[in-house]
Amino acid sequence: MSDTDRRSVGLIVHHVASMYPIEIDVARAIASGKAVTDVTWDAVAELNAKHAQEHAEETKTTALELLRRNSREASNAVCAFTDEQLDRAAPFSLSFGAPVTAQFIIEDHALRHSWHHLAGVRRALGR
């Protein structure tokens, strides 16, 4: 898809869809005040490589179905957070252990991550 990311558009869409449940679980943990210490950049790279290997042949239909389902479930989960939960902070290992809020996790991981890949998909498709 790009010079640095060789995954197909379909695989990227499936990847984004697959990450929503994980990102929501992290936001829920932070919202409950629990430190998230087991997520490292090495673990992210390993997860991404495993996903690419296991789902290299995903079809457009299955990738879009997963995206629709998981994004709807993620949206419902985000809407269920209270203001207090969104404001709660706890240490997060991807931020070098700095305390971050659940809102930050939602905005920086679920939303920014999707937006980042959408930009790459658009470039690949010439849009």
State each model region's role.
Residues 47-88:
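Acidic/histidine-rich alpha-helical segments that form the ligand environment
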Residues 1-46, 89-127:
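Short, contiguous alpha-helical
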